[in-house]
Curated annotation (Swiss-Prot):
Coiled coil: none annotated. The gene is dut. SUPFAM superfamilies: dUTPase-like (SSF51283). Keywords: Hydrolase, Magnesium, Metal-binding, Nucleotide metabolism. Substrate binds at R68, S69, G70, N81, L85, I86, D87, M95. This is Deoxyuridine 5'-triphosphate nucleotidohydrolase. Its EC number is 3.6.1.23.
Length: 149
């Protein structure tokens, strides 16, 4: 387990830090650091503060903000940017772009768990320009080229 620096921006988050729900959880739950309930109308989106900032420091790591499966499946609440990528050198408050893709209004309550944070390894690439690639079984076959199902 790696240690990550966290800055508490809103004092209410001091005892609400991201946590793994179970020993096998990959994602840490992020909470909506709101002063009042926030109602998202159908097809509306809003940046929701989490009340914390993290600093990964090491460029071998990044964080991803992902939707909570229950909110997406049961209520249509997903991320407006689909995935939030947090670079290792970012130090600002974590924000969740909440998007209501359903046809009914949804209310986010203060301190409700609204997304999850997953820490991932990163390999930075350096491009090597070539005029041709060596042959492979797939070649330039694109969408659907490997068959159905």
């Amino acid at each position: 387990m790696i240690k990550i620096d966290v800055k508490i921006i809103d004092p209410r988050m001091a005892d609400q830090l991201p946590a793994y729900a179970t020993p096998g959880s990959a994602g840490l739950d992020l909470r909506a650091c709101l002063d009042a309930p926030l109602t998202l109308l159908p097809n509306a989106w809003q940046l929701v503060p989490t009340g914390i900032a993290i600093y990964l420091k090491d460029p071998k790591f990044a964080a991803m903000i992902l939707p909570r499966s229950g909110l997406g499946h049961k209520h249509g609440i997903v991320l407006g940017n689909l995935v939030g990528l947090i670079d290792s050198d970012y130090q600002g408050q974590l924000m969740v772009s909440a998007w209501n893709r359903s046809d009914v209004a949804f209310t986010i309550e203060p301190m409700e768990r609204i997304a999850q944070l997953v820490i991932v390894p990163v390999l930075q690439a350096q491009f090597n320009v070539v005029s041709e690639f060596p042959a492979s079984a797939r070649g330039e076959g694109g969408y659907g080229s490997t068959g159905k199902g």
